[in-house]
Amino acid sequence: MALLGLAVAAVAAYAAQAGVSSGGGRCATYRPHIPSHSQFSKVIDNPYFPLPAGRTLIYRGVENGRKELDRVHVTSRTKRIEGISATVVDDNVYEPIGRLAERTFDYYAQDDRRNVWYLGEDTREFLPGGKVDTSGSWLTGRNGAKPGLIMEADPRVSDAYRQECRSGEAEDLAWVVDRGGSNRVPYRTFHHVLRSLEFSRLEPAIVDQKVYGPGVGAISERQLSGGHETLSLVRVTG
């Protein structure tokens, strides 16, 4: 209950900070301070969101009673977005295990202060009957889309920020609620973890708690409201 209360406070706090209301202009008034092209590095080594080429992370969990597997692979490929060279991450969700339910290519870049920027995603959800849903896809510079931060260089409790911004398609936000402590997942126990609440203006009833471990990145996810989903890190290679 306490975390749900924090989630509500986070939405209100961020709306006030960003100068937008929950039903207002949203991305139109959002003006991120994007560093110049020369201020982006070639590697992403933020302790809470490292993306070394070749690394693969495997997560297992349950969504609304169905088992799922999430395979996240950091490719060696890059994509140039608005002059910035972004690392391409290939994220595949299998639900039930064995059936590819969703495939997403995410694009990230790190500035020289070690903030990790989220520059866009190409997502495909595979529906019954061979249909493919691409809603949620966005790319910085197209259709008014703007980048957000997926991880700050030095995240602090009470920090709130946009992770992505394309009105009506991608409006995820994050609020840091704890830094420190330990968290055990099947892969191993992590110390000095970071916890955040993540939510979207498009689905305000859904609030996720995510935990990030130093040196690895996301290690667990749990839906606190709006559904029943859990994911935990089980293996890391590369």
What is the predicted role of each segment?
Residues Y14, G19-G238:
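Conserved functional acidic sites
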